[in-house]
A protein has these predicted regions:
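Terminal, regulation- and interaction-focused segments at domain boundaries
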Residues: 1-20, 24-25
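N-terminal intrinsically disordered, cationic/polar leader segments
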Residues: 2-8, 34-38, 42-74
Length: 74
């Protein structure tokens, strides 16, 4: 497989789609399995060893909360 290109994309989901993805993520975390998700046409495999954090940003009247999963590919 070739080297993956850098990318930084955001995908907007409906409430029901987002809830379904969060449920699948929670199930994967509880069972210690990897989490699969497709974002903007690319399937991503999040390993069980990933680190998780919550980030809060505020700028003027706008606020943002991000749930982040980070890992390094071996």
């Amino acid at each position: 497989m070739g080297e993956k290109r850098d990318r930084d994309v955001e995908k907007v989901y409906s409430v029901s789609e987002f809830v379904a993805k969060l449920r699948r993520l929670a199930d994967a975390l509880e069972t210690g399995e990897r989490f699969e998700i497709q974002v903007a046409g690319e399937r991503i495999y999040v390993p069980a060893r990933a680190e998780f954090n919550v980030e809060h940003e505020r700028e003027g009247n706008e606020e943002e909360v991000e749930f982040q999963l980070k890992w390094t590919n071996a």
